Amino acid sequence: MVTQSVEDSSRSGPRRTIVGDLLKPLNSEYGKVAPGWGTTPFMGVAMALFAIFLSIILEIYNSSVLLDGISVS
């Protein structure tokens, strides 16, 4: 037969790199969930600010009445 077996030396495990060593502490908390609400309020604030940003862009692009009370010079 022509089959070959893979040598054990090629299975030495994962290589260590500088980037991997720098990023490993960021992955140490993987799978753990903070008790309570965590960062949910911050996500809500970020979503609200993003919605305001999108409505401003829509106002500039479409000249709609969504922000009719705000004057644009």
Curated annotation (Swiss-Prot):
Entry GO MF terms: phosphate ion binding
Any single Pfam family the record assigns to this protein: PsbH
Transmembrane segments: 41-61
Residues found modified as Phosphothreonine: 3
GO cellular component labels: chloroplast thylakoid membrane; photosystem II
Source superkingdom: Eukaryota
Entry keyword annotation includes Phosphoprotein: yes
GO biological process: photosynthesis; protein stabilization
Compartment(s) of residence: Plastid, Chloroplast thylakoid membrane
Keywords: Chloroplast, Membrane, Phosphoprotein, Photosynthesis, Photosystem II, Plastid, Thylakoid, Transmembrane, Transmembrane helix
Primary role: One of the components of the core complex of photosystem II (PSII), required for its stability and/or assembly. PSII is a light-driven water:plastoquinone oxidoreductase that uses light energy to abstract electrons from H(2)O, generating O(2) and a proton gradient subsequently used for ATP formation. It consists of a core antenna complex that captures photons, and an electron transfer chain that converts photonic excitation into a charge separation.
UniProt subunit comment: PSII is composed of 1 copy each of membrane proteins PsbA, PsbB, PsbC, PsbD, PsbE, PsbF, PsbH, PsbI, PsbJ, PsbK, PsbL, PsbM, PsbT, PsbX, PsbY, PsbZ, Psb30/Ycf12, at least 3 peripheral proteins of the oxygen-evolving complex and a large number of cofactors. It forms dimeric complexes.
Entry similarity comment: Belongs to the PsbH family.
Protein name as it appears in the record: Photosystem II reaction center protein H
Species of the source: Amborella trichopoda
